[in-house]
Amino acid sequence: MASPTDFPDLKAPHPSHTGPTAIPLWRPHRAPSPPLTTVSERTKHKIMEKPLILISNDDGITAKGITELVRMVSPLGTVIVCAPDGPRSGRSRAFSLTPLTLTPFSAPQHSGGDVTWYSCNGTPVDCVKMAFALLCPRKPSLVIGGINHGDNASTNAHYSGTMGIAFEGTIKGVPSVAFSLCDYDADADFRPMEDIVRRVCRHVLTDGLPKGVCLNVNVPKAGTASDLRGVRICRMAQGGWHNEVEKIEGDIDESGRQRYILKGYYRNYEPEAEDTDAWALANGYVAVTPCTNDMTAYAMEERLQGIITGQGQDCRLS
């Protein structure tokens, strides 16, 4: 994983898989092919065969990143956008238990052709759920989160609403990708990553992904596409936030309670590890990290079995 690469064989079983067969490959959904008898039916069938792509984000439907993403991928299929009506960063996989609404949204200028836009008053995951239930005429071929303003690399991916979109897509049986740019500027330049976005999406639409696996694609800030040094398939770097809670001086609520805000700084615990997404980004590479919905710690199964049954050589958790 330490050397630059294009896209390796994503059909291989997950390293933790110990069964006799490989994890099945998800193929992009295609509508059935009924007999065609008239021109109108042929036209309708052609439209149905066009890949359906669902897009959402966590920066909100007015963010530049989602408009740029739609522009980049709209040539690849029919696009449905369902995104939060305002910023919902850090919502991860949260969904709402309160009433939700959908509102038609006027397509931003230069955002692409065959696109339907809706905003939702919920979380990013709410948007995916609402779109599947109410907006998509058939099962999508691809679910995309992004493009996020700011990276979602390392353990930060756990907090990401952009990644929550991709994980929700995999839960629903659809190949899914999250895209992020390492630039928090509201007017960030997304053009240098256009080629990588289209290449990844074409790859997934053509070859699918292993069941339960989505891709987390992080792109470093670059002046031009040629400034990107290449693509690395990486693991997630380990790190954490420090000095996270900051007192807001002089800010007391109506009940007399002090207000605080989460800030702090992020520390990479393994900055020298060249096989991580954090290293790739710091050195000018696009980082592609395969992520899985399966949270099982397979290495613990046998040891826990011994603890529960009282058998086995090692019944300790440490």
Model regions: which residues?
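Electrostatically charged, flexible surface regions
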Residues: 191-318
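Glycine/threonine-rich flexible loop motifs
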Residues: 151-160
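Short hydrophobic alpha-helical segments enriched in small aliphatic residues
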Residues: 15-18, 30
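Alpha-helix C-terminal capping segments
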Residues: 131-137, 164-175
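Short, Lys/Arg-enriched N-terminal segments with co-localized hydrophobic residues
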Residues: 32-47
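Glycine-rich phosphate/pyrophosphate-binding loops
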Residues: 170-192
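A cross-family phosphate/adenosyl-ligand binding-site feature
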Residues: 49-56, 64-139
